[in-house]
Structures are given as C-alpha cells and as structure tokens.
Amino acid sequence: MAVVDVHRFAESITCHAWSPDLSMVALCPNNTEVHIYKSLSQDHWERLHVLQKHDQIVSGIDWSSKSNKIVTVSHDRNSYVWSLEGAEWVPTLVILRLNRAALCVQWSPKENKFAVGSGAKTVCICYYEQENNWWVSKLIRKRHESSVTSVAWHPNNVLLATTSTDGKCRVFSTFIKGVDTKDSKAGSPAETKFGEQILQLDLSYSWAFGVKWSPSGNTLAYVGHSSMIYFVDDVGPSPLAQSVAFRDLPLRDVLFISEKMVIGVGYDSNPMVFAADDTGIWSFIRYIGEKKAASSGSSYSSQFSEAFGKFYGSQSKSTTANDASDSRGGVHDNSITSIVPLGKGGSPKVMRFSTSGLDGKIAIWDLENMQQELGNQF
C-alpha cells in the first residue's frame, strides 16, 4: 500500500497543515482550537501548543513555508496570523469585514498575501502594510452568488481560482499595486484591476469544491457534488474543458501530483487517481491502496443491494459494504476533507501527501513505490 503512516489525533479533524520542515502538524479537532503536534517517532506524537483565539469552529489552516507563519480562519468571521516568538505563538487579528463565516484560506506562492473564501459570497485578499503594522483585507464582492468553498493561487501570485456552491468556478485577478510586481509570468493579469473576473466556468450543476492549479499553472481542476471532476486547459478566453463522471461518492478536494495526474479525495474515504493520456483525455485510473485497479465489471445490482441494506440496517449487507471498503484500502473510516502536499512548493511532481478526515485520522501517503502501477503519466 502507498500509505506509510496513520495516526488518529482526535474524534474528527476539520483541516490540517504542515510546518516547513514537516516535523510538526497543525490541525483543528473540529472545535475552536488549533493543536500543534510534533513527531517524536513514527507512532508517537507530542502536543506542543494549543492556539486559542477563535470563538467558533476553525475552518481553515495554512502554514507558510518561507516565513513560518500560520494563518487560521473560522466561522466566527475572523482570521489570525500566528508568529512564533520564542516558544510561544503570538496571534495578530485580521479583520476580514465579513458578515458570514470564513470557510477556507491559503497563502499565495510568494506568501505576501493570503486569500479567504467565505459564506458571504465574498473573497478576502489580505496583505501586510508595513507602514501601519497591520493586515489589510480587500474584498472581491462581485460575481459569486453563494458561498465560496475553496480558493487556489496560480503560480504567478496574481490569479486566484475559486469554487462556490452556486456550481461555478471563477478566476480573478488579485493584482495589488505596491504588493505585486508587473514582472509577473502572465503579462495580461498584471495589467488587470483588482477583483476583475478573468474566467467563469459553468460546468457543474451542483455545488463545486476543491479547486487546484497544476504545477505549471496551465491546467485547472475542481470537483462537483454530483460525482464529477472537471479539468480545464488553456485558461483564458477560449478554455478547453473536460468532465469526468465516476459512479462513487462525490469528492471534496483534489491535488495535482504532476501535470497529467490528479489525486481526488472525498466521501468515498479513499484517494482516487485521475490521469490524462497522451492525447490529453482525462479518466479515472484506480484507488490508491487497493490491490488492483478498479474493475468496471462490478455489478450495479450488488451495489444497489449494499445501499438497500445500509438503508434498512441489514447486518449482512453492512458487512459486505465494509468488506468492499477494506479491499480499497480502508485507511480512513469516514469522509476525507482535505489533502495536503508534502514537499517543496512549485515542484513539478509530488511524491508524498497527507489526508485528514472526519474519522480524526491523518494519513501520510508515499507514491515512490507506485510509479510503475500509476503509469507514464506520473
């Protein structure tokens, strides 16, 4: 199996992030706190810090790799930037100016900004003002018709992709004079105004989640709540879009392993591999952790029987369903809510990543021994 370490930290985990040297992990145990653990051995983790400032559930955590700062957001509509001073983490309040919950957060590639998605149909772009010694929040208020479920920065540090429960994926310019430079790799976005919409994708007819850019920034991927995953090439005026449907439960988040391979995680409790062939056509490949590639020959009648048994609480059907889950890996016992790469940002390939879920576990996966099984796309 590709999983190399599994540890249960809590009853449930909302989100998690790793320190720059990967020796510590920050997680929210589905409450108002952020717990920081340090690995003493493969089987033993020590809790070093408990960050307590939020009044409601912490919904997003990101740990910067260069400045070693932690940013957190919560349903209490606030954000904190935590700096390590001596042996203590010191918080700085960031007033987001939201009237609904903050749902997700991510540092920009240069770590001079971070983006916050919210239930207020708004995206906050926050940056630090040296003159006033505080964090400023600029709002992108237009276009979104519902909650912003995820945000993803383009490698050029200017473009930002978002997904929303209105079913749409959008790309905005976040160029801020005095913060961003005009020598951005993408020439036109640096000339656009802050908050200007570059692209809107209407591919999903259900809630959309988990948007991510490929390492080069040429491809965009996100998922829909209707068990669909979408891939968009040549993001711009004439994008090339593909939709891949799968028969299992919906995904919640995705991660590009390489330019032609994506890992998706969600309600099926096991990572799924999608890859593009030599012609650029994307398809589902297999589950990570199962002993062999997923077979398309499984009878739909047996699947219906399992579902029927679950609905009526049948013990025999429940056992069958559990056996099927174990054959796919069985690392997580509940929905996987987040996937985080383990390695240097901007790397063309990701060999290791971690997942966390509602079962309170964090699993570390290593694809080093699976390259032959995953094929040339890796």
Curated annotation (Swiss-Prot):
Any one Gene Ontology molecular-function term assigned to this protein's record: actin binding
Descriptive protein name: Actin-related protein 2/3 complex subunit 1B
Region (Disordered): 319-340
Coarse class of the protein's main subcellular location: cytoplasm
PANTHER family, per the entry: ACTIN-RELATED PROTEIN 2/3 COMPLEX SUBUNIT 1, ACTIN-RELATED PROTEIN 2_3 COMPLEX SUBUNIT
First and last residues of every WD repeat: 8-47, 53-92, 97-138, 143-182, 203-242, 257-295, 331-375
Record's function text: Functions as a component of the Arp2/3 complex which is involved in regulation of actin polymerization and together with an activating nucleation-promoting factor (NPF) mediates the formation of branched actin networks. Arp2/3 complex plays a critical role in the control of cell morphogenesis via the modulation of cell polarity development.
Similarity comment text for this entry: Belongs to the WD repeat ARPC1 family.
InterPro entries in alphabetical order: ARPC1 (IPR017383), WD40/YVTN_repeat-like_dom_sf (IPR015943), WD40_repeat_dom_sf (IPR036322), WD40_rpt (IPR001680)
Distribution of this protein across tissues and organs: Expressed at low levels in all tissues with a relatively highest expression in inflorescences.
UniProt cross-references to Pfam families, sorted A to Z: WD40
Organism field: Arabidopsis thaliana (Mouse-ear cress)
Assembly notes: Component of the Arp2/3 complex composed of ARP2, ARP3, ARPC1/p41-ARC, ARPC2/p34-ARC, ARPC3/p21-ARC, ARPC4/p20-ARC and ARPC5/p16-ARC.
